[in-house]
Regions:
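Conserved donor-binding/catalytic core segment of Leloir-type glycosyltransferases
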Residues: 4, 195-213, 219-222, 235
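A short, active-site helix/loop in glycosyltransferases that binds the activated sugar's phosphate group
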Residues: 149-175, 183
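Short His-centered aromatic/hydrophobic patch
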Residues: 79, 97-103, 121
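Nucleotide-sugar donor phosphate/pyrophosphate-binding loop at the beta->alpha transition
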Residues: 75-79, 116, 125-150, 163, ...
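Conserved acidic donor-binding segment of nucleotide-sugar-dependent glycosyltransferases
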Residues: 320-321, 325-332, 341-346
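Short hydrophobic beta-strand element within catalytic cores of glycosyltransferases
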Residues: 305-308, 318
Length: 381
């Protein structure tokens, strides 16, 4: 069996690690995996792909510099020919597609191919995310009537996504699956020792430092807690250069609220084990309807409760005041109240952390179920 894994992004984040974990499972179980990655992939991504057969493609994504619109158009035309010729020559049994954008701009090559198309969906359909009525109106018709029909197997990473896909026009052909993310196995390369001014409960955030992830709201919640005399620290792991203007805004909040002794930015880290061991509670304060985050299952595996907002797909696997805190109100005040709960009830940290770990098995989030489900997707024809 030959599987082409589409990897059209250029750098390593949660979604990319999650897809590479699937490649690893398939390869370990006798499937031949060829990864079609971007010609603009970073050295870090290329290094992660060392153990796979690879093929570079000119994907119309993450292009930078002048004349970007022309570059996108050029690559869109290129990829139609590149992918069509490659699929015709190699005839893979399956193609694993990780994003709706890739599914859309590769529709023509897929349409003329006999390969089984597996779409791993971890985001809201674009028909929900785009605000332009003209775009949404036209695209929703193409999506429902044409693009979705070429998907043979839909793999959703949350019930939330399954429902959204059904609402957008998906009709299950009998092979669609719900597979929650298993935290990708990371290479725990030792970083410098995490330096933290530990003062009370240590909250942690790990991920992309961008507005939708709620880091600003997290710092504002920290400010409220400090004014109220609470003792706590916050450890933030992630690359601040992803959105420099946003990072500058965060630094200003820290300075203006005298949080220098409470907040620690440690940058992008490899040694995630040390990060989780240093933290007591993990904060995942996404302010948009995030379908799922790898960090939820990852925090469970390290016996850590997490704080989330009651939206998107994450409440499916976090039980309020049992394995974490589910905050109904998406607000700074709601977040600060949840954090204050752990500060005032430190015994709950260990208790809920243990329940979080046990819930991995109860919710079938363990690795054996993850492997079995993915192998059932890629069956011999």
């Amino acid at each position: 069996m030959v599987i082409l894994g589409i990897l059209d992004s250029t750098d390593m984040y949660g979604k990319e690690r999650a897809n590479m974990e699937v490649y690893h499972i398939l390869q370990e179980n006798g499937r031949k995996v060829i990864v079609g990655y971007s010609e603009n992939a970073t050295p870090a991504m290329k290094k992660e792909l060392d153990s796979y057969d690879g093929k570079t493609f000119s994907y119309p994504r993450d292009l930078k510099g002048r004349f970007r619109i022309l570059k996108y158009l050029e690559n869109f035309i290129k990829i139609q020919f590149q992918m069509s010729f490659w699929l015709k020559k190699h005839k893979p049994d399956y193609v694993l597609v990780p994003t709706e954008w890739a599914l859309t701009y590769l529709f023509l090559p897929f349409y003329f191919s006999k390969s089984i198309v597996v779409f791993r969906c971890g985001d809201d359909p674009l028909t929900y995310r785009k605000k332009n009525k003209w775009f949404t109106g036209i695209y929703s018709i193409l999506w429902k009537k044409i693009i979705l029909k070429r998907v043979d197997v839909l793999v959703s990473n949350a019930l939330y996504i399954q429902r959204r896909m059904k609402d957008s026009g998906r009709i299950d052909k009998g092979r669609d699956q719900l597979i929650y993310n298993f935290p990708p196995i990371r290479k725990n390369i030792k970083d410098n020792v995490l330096k933290i001014n530990k003062n009370g409960i240590v909250f942690g955030f790990i991920g992309r430092i961008v507005p939708e992830k709620g880091v600003k709201e997290l710092l504002e919640a920290m400010s409220i807690l400090k004014v109220n005399g609470k003792k706590m620290s916050l450890l933030i792991a992630g690359d601040p250069l992803v959105d420099k203007s946003y990072a500058d805004e965060l630094y200003s909040i820290i300075k203006n609220n005298n949080l220098e002794q409470n907040v620690n930015f440690v940058g992008k880290i490899n040694d995630v084990a040390s990060f989780y061991k240093t933290c007591d509670v993990i904060c995942i304060p996404s302010i948009y309807e995030e379908p799922m985050a790898n960090v939820v299952a990852e925090s469970k595996s390290y016996h850590k409760p997490c704080i989330i907002f009651n939206q998107g797909g994450m409440p499916e696997i976090v039980k309020d005041k049992v394995t974490g805190m589910v905050v109904n109100e998406v607000s700074v005040e709601g977040l600060s109240n949840a954090m204050a709960y752990y500060i005032d009830n430190p015994n709950e940290v260990l208790k809920q952390g243990e329940e979080a770990f046990l819930s991995i098995k109860k919710l079938n989030l363990d690795y054996s179920h993850f492997v079995a489900k993915w192998l059932s997707v890629f069956q011999e024809n």
